[in-house]
């Protein structure tokens, strides 16, 4: 009755012999924070930038250890947990471009805020989530899509924003090689647009993306 259990899994493609691919993979942890309680799930996607397959394997092992340690010691502080994931890894070796944390111990956590923290703390350049609020892995969600992006502050979204999108989409459909059923419209917010006096307000961020 004092034991807590976890199960770790990953599926990874590391750099091949000819270095014609990009190392990346999925890592998942199912874990309890208290004995005899329902488990939580943490899933993340990583991109490995080391130019050597052995180095990629070592980096992956390090991030796996950091993930387990961080969830058991820093789960009370999401930003501290996120920053701990790259402990012991040199800058730029691994990118974490998606992280999802769900379960009874994390019902108060909004995964969109975790996505924003990944970008804010330099673990990735961009994060993506759908209109339902679920976080997405960008390269998977946008594979073979024709992408139309509208950048703005969206505080709030205005008729001007919508008119720009409408006219842009109209012209975009006329482009050669555009398959209409593969068009994906994205709204883009930058960290600069979110910052107020150098600080990002979480409620303001959620109000805009809602």
Identify the role of each PLM range.
Residues 1-210:
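Nucleotidyltransferase catalytic core that binds NTPs
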């Amino acid at each position: 009755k004092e034991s807590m259990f976890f199960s770790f899994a990953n599926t990874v493609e590391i750099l091949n012999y000819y270095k014609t691919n990009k190392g990346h993979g999925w890592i998942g942890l199912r874990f309890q924070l208290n004995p005899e309680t329902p488990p939580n799930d943490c899933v993340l996607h990583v991109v490995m930038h080391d130019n050597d397959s052995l180095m990629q394997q070592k980096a992956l092992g390090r991030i796996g250890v950091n993930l387990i340690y961080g969830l058991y010691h820093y789960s009370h502080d999401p930003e501290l947990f996120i920053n701990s994931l790259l402990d012991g890894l040199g800058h730029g070796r691994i990118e974490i471009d998606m992280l999802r944390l769900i379960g009874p111990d994390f019902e108060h956590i909004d995964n969109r805020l975790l996505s924003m923290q990944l970008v804010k703390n330099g673990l990735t350049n961009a994060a993506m989530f759908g209109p339902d609020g679920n976080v997405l892995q960008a390269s998977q969600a946008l594979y073979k899509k024709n992408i139309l992006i509208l950048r703005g502050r969206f505080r709030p979204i205005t008729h001007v924003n919508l008119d720009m999108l409408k006219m842009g989409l109209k012209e975009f459909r006329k482009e050669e090689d555009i398959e209409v059923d593969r068009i994906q419209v994205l709204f883009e917010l930058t960290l600069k647009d979110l910052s107020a006096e150098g600080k990002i307000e979480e409620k303001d961020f959620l109000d805009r993306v809602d």
